[in-house]
Amino acid sequence: MNREFVEAMQHLALERGVSVEEILEAFKEALRKAYIKRQKGYKKEEIDQGKGPEVDVYIDPNSGRIEMVEVRRVVEKVEDPDKEIALAEALQYDPEVQVGDEMEFPINPEELSRMAIQDLRQILTQRLKESERNRIYNEYKDKEGQVLTGVVTRVDNRGNVFVELGRGEAYLPRSEQIPTEKYHPGQRIKVYLKKVDKSAKGPSLLVSRAHEKLLEHLLKQEVPEIAEGIVEIKAIAREPGRRSKVAVTSHNPNVDPIGACIGHKGQRIQAVSAELGREKVDIILWSKDPKEFIRNALSPAQVGSIELDPEAKKARVKVTKDQHSLAIGTGGQNVRLASKLTGYDIHFEEAEISDLDEALRRAAEEEAEARERKAREEFEKLFRDLG
């Protein structure tokens, strides 16, 4: 090897956008594998498993001179002829050698270089992929769980979408997409970074448009009261692209959490809906009373009495015939979302209108009692703070 070799390595490094050191390391690996494969007869899979002799390669980055040696450990009895040499044989090379020493046997690199160059491109490509995967992992690991803005680069024939996120390409599989949306190259979209995977052979950044956290982020972005902690999101249930229910509460008695989320003339909630493919977003008042929370979650339907089985997390709800279909919703959507939001498996029983009137009266009384209890707790807290 000579200076021309060094210049060729420099040119290849420039072409691939990597350092000369990385090119030289890749070439060393190619030389090692060429020797073990061509001279020792090992297959690629065996070499990758660490089989074969130990080979050290030295390359002078200035002159391009290459030195190669096969390293063997001196032992009394040889068990691995590729990595060991018997003491009796070793003494023929060095009369002062001892058991446990390592001996180096020179290898002529010239005849291997041509073979190694054939493998260099493949090894270099593999190393570059590993290097790129490590870079993406280190850059994006701390961003896992965040919402990022990216640009769609391509859509494959199975409908999976690839999104450019600055210096990394993310993978948006069909299972994480909003079903009602169509994606096209050049389109800017917001995505939730669900997982950063270093070991993946394919794309290592998994993103989602269907995740509840994306909706939560958009609400924080549009509703200052949420961003400031005045209004708190307690639970979210989504059927992406179609409908969502969001349970909220206010830590300030002067702030209406539902009104804050909806905004003047519905502007805030409409902006969120537009970002999610016109997904309908219902804002629900959260309550620590499970019955009241379930009643609110089933809105816009009006329901009667509610019986709970807290251990089984089941709720039996009475509803009149004219409210039954509204409580269930199209294709069962309303009750599915309410169940997911509250954590209760909700079942309905039809009730007479008179029964419903009585149930609504009791519900109103319970709600009034709950408001009075809450006001009393806030007054007592204020009194303690002043004291």
From Swiss-Prot:
GO cellular component terms, alphabetically, are:
cytosol
Domain KH positions? 312-379
- Main location (coarse class): cytoplasm
Subcellular location, record wording:
Cytoplasm
Pfam families recorded: KH_5 (PF13184), NusA_N (PF08529), S1 (PF00575)
| Residue span, S1 motif domain | 145-209
Instruction: Specify whether Transcription is a keyword of the entry.
Output: yes
Q: What does this protein do?
A: Participates in both transcription termination and antitermination.
Q: How does it assemble?
A: Monomer. Binds directly to the core enzyme of the DNA-dependent RNA polymerase and to nascent RNA.
Q: What name goes with this protein?
A: Transcription termination/antitermination protein NusA
Name the species this protein comes from: Thermus thermophilus (strain ATCC 27634 / DSM 579 / HB8)
Q: Which gene encodes it?
A: nusA
